[in-house]
Amino acid sequence: MIVHDLREESEFDPSKHIEKILGTLEGGDYTVACWEPGQVSPYHCHPDATEIYFCFEGGGIMRTLDGEVPVTPGAFIVHPPAELHEYENGSERTLLFRVRYGGEKYSRATQRRGYPDWKQSPEEVEYFKSVAAE
């Protein structure tokens, strides 16, 4: 049995959200994601992995190509492999419990709101070109 207290494991940074990997199991990992008010994730996907979020406390908005949904305590969101998504935190600190499983856990981003100097990596450019060509 593995036990974690998300509040005790939490780490916050005013300049960016923190994703602290708590452990790994065969085929995946599990994380506490810590968000300060107003922080926004990159608009990204995990080409080969499913990503699952559970809102422990706080909340915000999750966006995909299909629209947006409120993320509130108790909300459970599943992103299948390659689904583009962006999380924007609300007005209070938020703890999200995240599980990633399946293939490789890397992400590919298309944009990063609030970071004017951010640029896609060559791997990200190539990935989205290949997806558009399919």
Regions found by a protein language model. Name each.
Residues E26, R63-G67, G90:
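Short strand-coil-strand connectors
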Residues M1-V32, P42, Q111-E134:
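A short, N-terminal "cap"/entry segment at the start of jelly-roll beta-barrel domains
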Residues C34-E36, C45-M62:
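Short, conserved beta-strand element in jelly-roll/cupin
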Residues I61, P81-R108:
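Ligand-binding loop in jelly-roll beta-barrel domains
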